[in-house]
Amino acid sequence: MGHMVNAVKQIPTFLDLGANALEMDVTFKNEEPTYTYHGVPCDAFRDCIRWEYFNVFAKTLREYTTPGFDKYREQLILLVFDLKTGDMNNAQARTAGVNTAKQLLQYYWNNDNNGGRAYVVLSIPDIAQHELIKGFKETLKKEGHENLLDKVGYDFSGPYLPRLPTLDETHEAFKKAGVEGHVWLSDGLTNFSPLGDMARLKEAIKSRDSANGFINKIYYWSVDKVSTAEKALKVGVDGIVTNHPDVIIGVLNENGFKDKYRLATYDDDPWETFGK
């Protein structure tokens, strides 16, 4: 999964390096998704201030994920929108969810008329913002496009302070949001942070694989080193966020990995837990 792809020119760059998914940062203005932009600080050796207007970026993503367009790339099957809503209260987050649904419906799904086919994950930075998901889902239903929810998954990634939520707290937030299935969970550190023991990641994977697990897929960020990618795969992640997709492709082709792992294709179900 290509990390921090926020400018239109970066899309083909990451795809040419082998990415089959892209992660974008969505910055809001008055609860309206306005820019794809991360800002400083960010991962080491990256340009933190690349950006585009959200509607332009969404329309461009449609061209890369809709058969028939010159830009179409069959490999691009998943889009992760990292929603920068951390400073919003729950009511504001609901409005942000409504507006995100409207903009994706218009600019990416083209009002469900030959729209982009990629799966979408909404990554929300705070478990207290469960109303964002409700607003998003209810808007698509109200607009008559409930079917598009089949293509959408959800991730609560925080908050990080004063501590990360427990898995039970995260599960409760999904219940409040009315989400059962289509659950992704992210874990990780910036690419310049010490790796650590991956304790939370291992706990999440154990929960995913349990009989009553609520998580469908787990992805880890930001993985730029061969050694880190190898450790993440051995632990059992479903996805890897990276600034260097070619490095991950190389690891997937190594002995010990190439017989167990491969890049996902459009025919794979992103909401199905592997191995269950």
From Swiss-Prot:
- A GO-annotated cellular component: extracellular region
Q: Does the keyword Lipid metabolism apply?
A: yes
Where along this sequence does the record place binding of Mg(2+)? Answer: 23, 25, 82
Q: In which tissues is it expressed?
A: Expressed by the venom gland.
Query: What are the catalytic residues?
Result: 3, 38
Cite the EC number: 4.6.1.-
Protein location: Secreted
Q: What's any GO biological process attached to this entry? A: killing of cells of another organism
Recorded catalytic reaction(s): these are: an N-(acyl)-sphingosylphosphocholine = an N-(acyl)-sphingosyl-1,3-cyclic phosphate + choline; an N-(acyl)-sphingosylphosphoethanolamine = an N-(acyl)-sphingosyl-1,3-cyclic phosphate + ethanolamine; a 1-acyl-sn-glycero-3-phosphocholine = a 1-acyl-sn-glycero-2,3-cyclic phosphate + choline; a 1-acyl-sn-glycero-3-phosphoethanolamine = a 1-acyl-sn-glycero-2,3-cyclic phosphate + ethanolamine
Q: Which UniProt keywords apply?
A: Cytolysis, Dermonecrotic toxin, Disulfide bond, Hemolysis, Lipid degradation, Lipid metabolism, Lyase, Magnesium, Metal-binding, Secreted, Toxin
**Cysteines engaged in disulfide bonds, as pairs:** 42-48
Predominant subcellular localization, coarse grouping? secreted
Coiled coil spans = none
Q: Which domain of life is it from?
A: Eukaryota
Answer whether the UniProt record assigns the keyword Cell inner membrane to this protein: no
Describe how the cofactor binds: Binds 1 Mg(2+) ion per subunit.
Instruction: Extract the InterPro entries matched here.
Output: PLC-like_Pdiesterase_TIM-brl
Required cofactor(s): Mg(2+)
MF term (GO), any: metal ion binding
Q: Which family does it belong to?
A: Belongs to the arthropod phospholipase D family. Class I subfamily.
Q: What does this protein do?
A: Dermonecrotic toxins cleave the phosphodiester linkage between the phosphate and headgroup of certain phospholipids (sphingolipid and lysolipid substrates), forming an alcohol (often choline) and a cyclic phosphate. This toxin acts on sphingomyelin (SM). It may also act on ceramide phosphoethanolamine (CPE), lysophosphatidylcholine (LPC) and lysophosphatidylethanolamine (LPE), but not on lysophosphatidylserine (LPS), and lysophosphatidylglycerol (LPG). It acts by transphosphatidylation, releasing exclusively cyclic phosphate products as second products.
Protein name listed in UniProt: Dermonecrotic toxin Ls4SicTox-alphaIII1i
State the organism named in the record: Loxosceles sp. (strain 4 GJB-2008) (Recluse spider)
